[in-house]
């Protein structure tokens, strides 16, 4: 029930990764990358399907060898979600996976080779109508740029990006997006800011090698949050040393917190104190697990007492405000006659949330049909 995001997004061109639009006002796409051995087709397919289940729009797959390229062919045949092939060092692998139906090619200018090799990749991408991501990384800049700047700097990352943007421009190829990732938040943010002023192409956001699940999520939220709040970014990946499924969840949580794109339930919950009338922490943790299948955007407030409970509930789709013996229940900001037993809040609220989600889905379908008329 909270208002729309006040963020004005940067204008960019539009490309498509498979059937997923990127840029020009399209929803910010959330993606992850498999961490299985690509040659283990069954494991890689299973992980891709797990990512798709939690809402991934795009999945990137590392293709380090020709054997991996042959495995990629089999993987592509077994999944529906768009796949990006991550190519380093050997440009010929890009040519091979293009034959196998890849939806996007990620190339790293720091190691893909000379302009003639890039030309070969671009011409192949053009023939197969495949977009490219120019993926700059602070840890793998070209040797001459490393020598020039001594260390990764915003100027270094942007210069590397612009070199290859210029190559694609000369080849009259405009179906590409760009990333300038770094593990340092300020370095990445400033690099993206500068690049956003110089090109119109979509930008893929990420803080590379951000760390483990907790620290990496925080670092990514800070860095990407700064950029997204300024309207910069058309697609993103959260890089965690963790289960890739967590990357998708964190990505959507960041977008949800900025009201840019919502998927599933936005739980508003207090940190608890001695005033709580029911187990708020246990309730939230249990409901988050039980309701992972709900994709309907919805605000649900779970507050343990009457200090902030009513106020939060009044701006939520559903809300519970703790009170002695029985807690108050709100729907669409209005307090209901029904009250929840404090020892059974989880089951009662789950039932209400599922019913509300179904109702909102019906209303959304009706609204879409009205617009289409």
Curated annotation (Swiss-Prot):
Its EC number is 1.17.7.3. It holds the Pfam family GcpE. Keywords: 4Fe-4S, Iron, Iron-sulfur, Isoprene biosynthesis, Metal-binding, Oxidoreductase. One of its GO terms (biological process) is terpenoid biosynthetic process. One of its GO terms (molecular function) is 4-hydroxy-3-methylbut-2-enyl-diphosphate synthase activity (flavodoxin). It comes from the Bacteria. Belongs to the IspG family. This is 4-hydroxy-3-methylbut-2-en-1-yl diphosphate synthase (flavodoxin).
């Amino acid at each position: 029930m909270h208002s729309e995001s006040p963020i004005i997004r940067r204008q960019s061109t539009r490309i498509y990764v498979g059937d997923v639009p990127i840029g020009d006002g399209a929803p910010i796409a959330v993606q992850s990358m498999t961490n299985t051995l690509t040659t283990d087709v069954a494991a890689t397919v299973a992980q891709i399907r797990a990512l798709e289940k939690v809402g991934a729009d795009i999945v990137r797959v590392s293709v380090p060898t020709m054997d991996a390229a042959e495995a990629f062919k089999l993987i592509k045949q077994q999944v529906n979600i768009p796949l990006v092939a991550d190519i380093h060092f050997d440009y010929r692998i890009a040519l091979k996976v293009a034959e196998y139906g890849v939806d996007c090619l990620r190339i790293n200018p720091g190691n893909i080779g000379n302009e003639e090799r890039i030309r070969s990749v671009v011409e192949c991408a053009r023939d197969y109508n495949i977009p490219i991501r120019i993926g700059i990384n602070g840890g793998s800049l070209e040797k001459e740029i490393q020598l020039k700047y001594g260390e990764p700097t915003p100027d270094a990352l942007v210069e590397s990006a612009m070199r290859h943007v210029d190559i694609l421009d000369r080849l009259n190829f405009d179906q590409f997006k760009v990333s300038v990732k770094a593990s340092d938040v300020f370095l990445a943010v400033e690099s993206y800011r500068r690049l956003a002023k110089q090109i119109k192409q979509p930008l893929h956001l990420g803080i590379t090698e951000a760390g483990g699940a907790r620290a990496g999520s925080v670092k990514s939220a800070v860095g990407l949050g700064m950029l997204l709040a300024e309207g910069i970014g058309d697609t993103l990946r959260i890089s965690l040393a963790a289960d890739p499924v967590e990357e998708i969840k964190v990505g959507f949580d960041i977008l949800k917190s900025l009201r840019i794109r919502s998927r599933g339930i936005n739980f508003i919950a207090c940190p608890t104190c001695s005033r709580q009338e029911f187990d708020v922490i246990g309730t939230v943790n249990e409901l988050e697990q039980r309701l992972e299948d709900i994709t309907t955007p919805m605000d649900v407030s779970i507050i343990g007492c009457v200090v902030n409970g009513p106020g939060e509930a009044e701006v939520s789709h559903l809300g519970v405000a703790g009170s002695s013996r029985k807690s108050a229940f709100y729907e669409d900001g209005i307090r209901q006659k029904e009250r929840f037993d404090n020892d059974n809040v989880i089951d009662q609220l789950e039932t209400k949330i599922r019913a509300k989600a179904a109702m909102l889905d019906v209303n959304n379908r009706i609204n879409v049909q009205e617009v289409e008329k």
